[in-house]
Every structure is written in structure tokens, then in C-alpha cells.
Regions:
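Glycine-rich beta-strand-to-loop/alpha-helix junction loops that act as flexible
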Residues: 13-15, 40
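ATP/nucleoside-binding phosphotransfer catalytic cores, i.e., glycine-rich phosphate-binding loops
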Residues: 130, 136, 161, 171-247
Length: 247
């Protein structure tokens, strides 16, 4: 981005981590070309959000007649994310996955680490501001969503949109196993629009996560930021080639 200035289209070949690097570079240098995605990662969350296809060949073909659509993004201090920002249980699981052996046996190393996280009591007392309103309580996870998917799973709320000018906030206060099942295990049938004990949901333009300090935040699978955090939506910041969803 520092060297290339006059271009209209960027094709990103890779997963959400690669896309994260590209959009942060474009944001830093105030560039806004059209972006096309050819998925090549583990989960490919944002390629699903733009409905371009999970298969690289299929996605390449879909790009030929895709439409340009503007999408919001999450600004966390000075870094950008497209899909989500989270602390607590999901971030702890991401850290366990990062620690796991990346060899053939990596997945088998990761599974017991997941259950280790689920069975530990790692809840925390939080203080937050959501659009100026102060909230305090105890939680196992705070999850801020912009995209439609997280970790390959559809975010379980029916009216979420990455182009509506707001972020969706989930504060999970129930037991870890219950929260894990609700948010990631039953997303096709479980809808947080319904009243659910132990889970608070909000729509917000700005979130301040005040305490506790020092929690590692997972932003689109990247683990390089810690709390406290100032989070806000940047409306229609990026242009992606996308396909409409069938009604």
C-alpha cells in the first residue's frame, strides 16, 4: 500500500488473516479500492459473508459477475476487523488453538485444550460502556460481531448485517458449556433474537471495554491486542465484490 497508489481492484487470495492484513494496510493509507476474495483459509468467514463461495474455483468464477457492495468494519483503537472482536471464552480457545501443534496431530492436540478451557471457571468482572451507557457484571465472554460468520459458524441472530451501521454485542453470562453450545453449536436453530437467560444482546455504534485490563482480544482470529479497548463501527468503509443471497 505504501508503494502502490493508483489501483482500482485488489484480489486477495487467502483466509481471514490475510484479508485482515490487507484491509489494515488499506485503512492506514486511506485507500478504498474494490476488493475481491478467493478463499484459502481455514474458516473463510468474510468470503461467506460476501457470499462469494468457499471453494477457490467457484469463488473465482463468481467474481466475474459479482456486484460491488459497501461494508462496515470494526475499528478497535487503531486496528480494523471485518468479522468480530471478542474477549473471554472464544479468545481463550483461539489461544489454545495457536498453542496446539500445527503438525498432522495438531487437531488432536487442540481438542483437549478446548475442553480444558470449557471446564475452567475463567469468568471475569467487567465494566463497559455501550453507546455511553455503563454496564457492569460477570461474564465468560464478550463478543462484538460485524460479519455474518465466526469460526466458520453463522452468528446466531437473524437481523445482523455488515452494512447497517451498527455492531451486534453479546455478553455471555451463563455457564461456559451452555454458552459454547448456544453460540457455536446450534447456530442454525438458535436465535439470540429470542429471550435467552444469561446472554445480553445490544446494537451499538461505540463500545468501550474498560476492565479488566490485560485480556487478550481475538480480532478476526488475530491475537495481538489487549484490553482496555475502544471499539466503534466505521460505516461503509470497504467495497467488496459480493453475490446476493437467495431469498
Amino acid at each position: 500500500c505504501k508503494e502502490l497508489k493508483d489501483f482500482d481492484l485488489v484480489i486477495v487470495v487467502g483466509g481471514d488473516g490475510t484479508i485482515n492484513e490487507v484491509i489494515n494496510g488499506l485503512y492506514d493509507y486511506d485507500m478504498n479500492p474494490v476488493i475481491g476474495i478467493i478463499p484459502g483459509g481455514s474458516f473463510n468467514d468474510f468470503s461467506k459473508t460476501v457470499n462469494i463461495g468457499a471453494d477457490p474455483v467457484e469463488a473465482s468464477e463468481n467474481l466475474l459477475d459479482a456486484e460491488v457492495k459497501e461494508y462496515d468494519c470494526i475499528l478497535n483503537d487503531d486496528k480494523i476487523a471485518l468479522n468480530f472482536w471478542t474477549v473471554g471464552m472464544a479468545s481463550e480457545n483461539a489461544q489454545k488453538m495457536q498453542e496446539a501443534d500445527k503438525s498432522t496431530f495438531g487437531v488432536f492436540t487442540y481438542i483437549p485444550k478446548i475442553f480444558e478451557t470449557l471446564t475452567q471457571d475463567n469468568s471475569f468482572d467487567y465494566e463497559m460502556e455501550i453507546d455511553g451507557k455503563t454496564l457492569k457484571g460477570n461474564a465468560v465472554m464478550v463478543f462484538v460481531a460485524n460479519g455474518l460468520y465466526s469460526g466458520g459458524v453463522e452468528v446466531p441472530i437473524s437481523d445482523i448485517s455488515p452494512s447497517d451501521g451498527v455492531l451486534n454485542v453479546f455478553i455471555v453470562e451463563q455457564s461456559k458449556i451452555g454458552a459454547f453450545k448456544a453460540m457455536f453449536g446450534q447456530s442454525n436453530s438458535f436465535d439470540f433474537n429470542e429471550e435467552n437467560e444469561g446472554v445480553q444482546t445490544f446494537k451499538a455504534k461505540e463500545i468501550k471495554f474498560i476492565s479488566p485490563e490485560g485480556l487478550i482480544a481475538d480480532t478476526d482470529g488475530e491475537l495481538y491486542q489487549k484490553t482496555p479497548s475502544n471499539i466503534k463501527v466505521v460505516e461503509k468503509r470497504f467495497k467488496f465484490l459480493s453475490k446476493p443471497f437467495e431469498q
